[in-house]
Regions:
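Aromatic/hydrophobic pocket-lining residues that form the small-molecule binding cavity
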Residues: 4, 63-66, 96, 160, ...
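Active-site clefts of carbohydrate-active enzymes
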Residues: 85
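Short acidic/glycine-rich loop or secondary-structure boundary segments that cap or lie
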Residues: 53-55, 88-92, 122-126
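Core AdoMet radical
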Residues: 1-32, 36-69, 78-82, 113-117
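Auxiliary Fe-S-binding modules of radical SAM enzymes
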Residues: 101-184
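Catalytic cores of alpha/beta
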Residues: 88-105
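Flexible, glycine- and charge-enriched loops at secondary-structure boundaries
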Residues: 59-63, 93, 157
Length: 184
């Protein structure tokens, strides 16, 4: 974990800078950080259906707690939702429907970033069997060379285009599409 006060103070050095960071631990955010130039700090609360979070990030804040933390964080700084990674599998839209309903029921309507699953091919050697079942779907995935020369896996672009449209259509049932800053 980082010394966030040090990071935030760095961004105070120049009026043109703004910090933005994603977290899976919004309930552990220290109150003293609220004082540090809140108008120049953006927190992106990472959300995914709890079913996926239980497998992929078992030691992080549970999704409902993350959602419930957002109104408090909004009192102090700009808050976005980071829907990432977006996982595709049978029934995936039902899982995201439940998630969007929970966010809407909490009265949250903020900008968001949406990122479909991309993962490093070498990670497969370290993944548990449950993680592998969720992440590794070679019939619908392809290799992608990253800008850092890593071998990454992502959903095939032809399929992903349709996934993005389905995700956006579902999102639009709950929120204004203009809330999506980017989706890929």
């Amino acid at each position: 974990h980082y010394d966030w006060a040090k990071v935030f103070r760095f961004f105070q050095q120049d009026n043109m800078l703004k910090s933005t960071f994603a977290t899976k631990y919004p309930t552990r955010f220290k109150p003293e950080l609220y004082e540090l130039t809140p108008e120049r700090n953006r927190i992106r609360v990472s959300l995914m259906p709890q079913k996926y979070s239980d497998v992929l990030e078992p030691y992080t804040d549970i999704i409902s707690d993350r959602i419930q933390s957002i109104p408090n964080l909004q009192n102090y700084m700009e808050v976005h939702i980071n829907y990432s990674p977006i996982i595709y599998e049978e029934g995936w839209l039902d899982e995201y429907r439940k998630l969007f309903q929970e966010v809407k029921d909490a009265g949250i309507d903020v900008k968001c970033e949406c990122i479909f699953l991309t993962h490093n091919v070498h990670q497969h050697a370290r993944n548990s069997e449950d993680v592998q079942k969720l992440l590794w779907k070679p019939d619908i995935q392809e290799c992608k060379d990253s800008q850092y020369a890593a071998d990454n896996i992502r959903y095939k672009w032809q399929l992903k285009r349709g996934m993005i449209e389905e995700f956006k259509a579902l999102y639009a049932e709950f929120f204004d599409l203009s809330n999506i800053r980017y989706i890929f």
